[in-house]
Regions:
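Bacterial N-terminal signal peptides that target proteins for export
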Residues: 1-10
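Hydrophobic h-region of N-terminal signal peptides that target proteins for export
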Residues: 9-20
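Scaffold/interface architecture of coatomer-like assemblies
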Residues: 19-313
Length: 313
């Protein structure tokens, strides 16, 4: 499978919100919905998972929207593990591998996972599977050498996730220890953020940057923070390598405890413009909500689906 990603260009088609055959359908009928996966934490960073619908308000370009669907549910996810395999990761890989496996073990049993190891190029070492044996083999495929093609690897992983992922909710976990040194100039950070927003992929990142030169660490943080913030994920920067396992378990827990919020935009035009999304929440502990910051008003960004009204339990 090595070299699979070279030259991979996959058009982003309109996604469907129809549930998979082994899932309870979320929606039915005909409508156009913008679907958000939202995390809520209190001032101490603890996830709040039992807030009512009336605690939330959703705004698009400043205009309040009517929430059509609201629920908190542990839905199966398509997950991509994008792991830095450059030369500087050689002494860090063992702990990163263990943390990656612990995340998978703590995830929904119906999740599907693929693994990309990257250095100067990206390698698809394991296609989508929930076979733990295959995942262990892929994560343990150590060949730490070369540079860090961070942007290229994330871009290609988004393409693969959108083309092959069978679950409606899609997540990338990126683990790296340095700034990009090998990506081409085609995928600038701005273009990559646009792609992430158009693809509706949640991006979580772990930056092992404590040993990086301050200037290089700052550039790496800009990439990881921009992608995580725009997509509704979060970037972590542990001071010690030993913290990685705890972070991986925290990410797995968050993915399984997000709110699903959907609305039909008051502005129905599919004019290709970017629509800013802002969600507020009220509750104990001064809660803060995190979700994607917007979408492009196209068939891919605000999904034309055959699903509209919630099929509530």
């Amino acid at each position: 499978l090595r070299g699979f990603f070279k030259g991979l260009l996959i058009p982003l088609a309109a996604a469907t919100l129809l549930a998979q055959s082994d899932e309870v359908p979320l929606f039915k009928a005909d409508s156009r919905l913008v679907v958000l996966h939202a995390s809520v934490v209190d001032r101490k960073g603890k996830l709040l998972t039992d807030l009512p619908e009336n605690a939330f308000k959703v705004y698009e370009n400043g205009a309040e929207q009517n929430i059509k669907v609201f629920r908190r549910e542990d839905v199966p996810v398509s997950i991509g593990m994008v792991i830095d395999n450059s030369g500087s990761m050689r002494d860090k890989r063992a702990k990163v591998e263990r943390a990656s496996l612990d995340l998978v073990k703590a995830s929904n049993p119906q999740d599907e996972v693929f693994i990309v190891n990257f250095n100067d190029e990206a390698y698809l070492d394991v296609e989508f599977t929930n076979d733990m044996r295959l995942l262990e083999q892929g994560i343990a495929r150590i060949d730490s050498r070369g540079g860090t093609a961070l942007r290229d690897s994330i871009s290609m992983s988004i393409d693969y996730l959108k083309e092959k992922g069978k679950k409606d909710k899609k997540v990338l976990l990126v683990i790296t220890d340095g700034n990009d040194t090998a990506s081409n100039d085609r995928d600038t950070l701005e273009k990559l953020v646009d792609k992430a927003q158009k693809s509706e992929v949640l991006i979580f990142a772990v930056g092992l940057l404590s040993e990086e030169e301050p200037h290089e660490a700052k550039k790496a943080k800009r990439v990881l923070n921009s992608l995580a913030t725009a997509s509704g994920g979060l970037a972590y920067y542990p001071k010690e390598l030993a913290e990685v396992d705890e972070i991986a378990l925290r990410v797995a827990h968050e993915i399984r405890n997000q709110y699903i919020i959907a609305y039909t935009p008051t502005n129905p035009a599919l004019d290709g413009t970017f629509r800013q999304i802002h969600v507020t929440v009220k509750g104990p502990g001064s809660p803060v909500v995190r979700t994607r910051t917007g979408y492009y008003a196209t068939a891919a960004g605000a999904r034309e689906t055959k699903a509209a009204s919630a099929r509530m339990p």
